[in-house]
Amino acid sequence: MAMMSTVELTKENFDEVVQGEDNKEFVLIDFWAAWCGPCRQFAPVFERTSDKHPDITFAKVDTEAQQELAAAFDIRSIPTLAIIREGVLVFAQPGALPEATLEDLIAQARKLDMAEVHAGVAAQKATQD
């Protein structure tokens, strides 16, 4: 039996999963719903990819059950893939991605200079205050 490598994300466990012990987490989130055909097609791709990246948390949000979470991410169409690194949303895009595209996206997200990303977020916050 294969180990379930994806986590069901809810508003109850969201902070714990996304921030982790030290807020250094790398999380991919698949926003989906049972009635959504493309979501069902993307699910095995998401699962297979999760097996190849044990250091990344692959999480799924059932947008029907978790409407508040879906609203918080401003999800307008599904599936939508979001990537959070160190507590920062670094990518969000609707559409069922082919496996190669998903792998490429993960590689790009791994290469991000998070110090730079955090500096950018801080600068953005400063202009809003």
Locate each region found by the language model.
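Proteins that catalyze or organize thiol-disulfide redox chemistry
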Residues: M1-T57, E64-D129
